[in-house]
């Protein structure tokens, strides 16, 4: 008899609507993405960047540790020796479509030249735009230098 009354008064539907109405008047937890952004963790791994020293010289010493450790083989480096005996890169390419953003290149770098920055909005319509050359990586480093420095400082105790 009770089951008959429950089905007659559409008990399940009333319970479902009550639950819906209860959540309808609660505060919203979503954000309006393009206009509001959630905070990013200091350990977030985003778009790659090559850093420079304070005097403007690029940090990369062409040791190729990042190329060797990259599990996706997304990094290609070519280097040449300078007159003073040091080496500098002539080509430093990262294929962002191959990259798995593991951060091993950043961990392997002895001079903190290659880092993964806070930027996560670098979508593109073409594959060639996602193959970053040395100039693009250095531009990213110049653009995000303050954020990268503070990120590395906050992450220092975990390295």
From Swiss-Prot:
Stated membrane topology is: Peripheral membrane protein
Q: Where in the cell is it found?
A: Cell inner membrane
Q: Which cofactors does this protein require?
A: [4Fe-4S] cluster
Organism of derivation: Rickettsia canadensis (strain McKiel)
The entry's function note states:
NDH-1 shuttles electrons from NADH, via FMN and iron-sulfur (Fe-S) centers, to quinones in the respiratory chain. The immediate electron acceptor for the enzyme in this species is believed to be ubiquinone. Couples the redox reaction to proton translocation (for every two electrons transferred, four hydrogen ions are translocated across the cytoplasmic membrane), and thus conserves the redox energy in a proton gradient.
Tell me its family. Answer: Belongs to the complex I 23 kDa subunit family.
Q: Which residues form the 4Fe-4S ferredoxin-type domain?
A: 51-80, 90-119
Q: Which residues bind [4Fe-4S] cluster 1?
A: 60, 63, 66, 109
NCBIfam families named among the record's database cross-references: NuoI, PRK05888.1-4, PRK05888.1-5
Cysteines engaged in disulfide bonds, as pairs: none
Q: Could you describe the subunit structure of this protein?
A: NDH-1 is composed of 14 different subunits. Subunits NuoA, H, J, K, L, M, N constitute the membrane sector of the complex.
Q: Predominant location of this chain?
A: membrane
- Top EC class, one word: translocase
**Alphabetized SUPFAM superfamilies for the sequence:** 4Fe-4S ferredoxins (SSF54862)
Reactions catalysed, as given in the entry: a quinone + NADH + 5 H(+)(in) = a quinol + NAD(+) + 4 H(+)(out)
The cofactor remark states: Binds 2 [4Fe-4S] clusters per subunit.
Gene Ontology CC: plasma membrane
Superkingdom = Bacteria
Q: Where does [4Fe-4S] cluster 2 bind?
A: 70, 99, 102, 105
Query: What protein am I looking at?
Result: NADH-quinone oxidoreductase subunit I
Give the GO terms filed under biological process for this record.
Answer: aerobic respiration
**Can the keyword Cell division be found in this entry's annotation?**
no
């Amino acid at each position: 008899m009770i089951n008959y009354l429950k089905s007659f008064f559409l008990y399940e539907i009333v319970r479902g609507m009550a639950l819906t109405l209860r959540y309808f008047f609660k505060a919203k937890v979503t954000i309006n993405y393009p206009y509001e952004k959630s905070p990013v963790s200091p350990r977030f791994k985003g778009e790659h960047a090559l850093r420079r020293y304070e005097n403007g010289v690029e940090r990369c010493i062409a040791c190729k540790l990042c190329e060797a450790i990259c599990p996706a083989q997304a990094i290609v480096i070519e280097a040449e020796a300078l007159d003073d005996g040091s080496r500098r890169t002539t080509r430093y390419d990262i294929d962002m479509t191959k990259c798995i953003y593991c951060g091993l290149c950043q961990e392997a770098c002895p001079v903190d030249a290659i880092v993964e920055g806070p930027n996560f909005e670098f979508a593109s319509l073409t594959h060639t735009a996602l193959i970053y050359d040395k100039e693009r990586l250095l531009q990213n480093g110049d653009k995000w230098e303050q954020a990268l420095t503070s990120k590395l400082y906050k992450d220092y105790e975990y390295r």
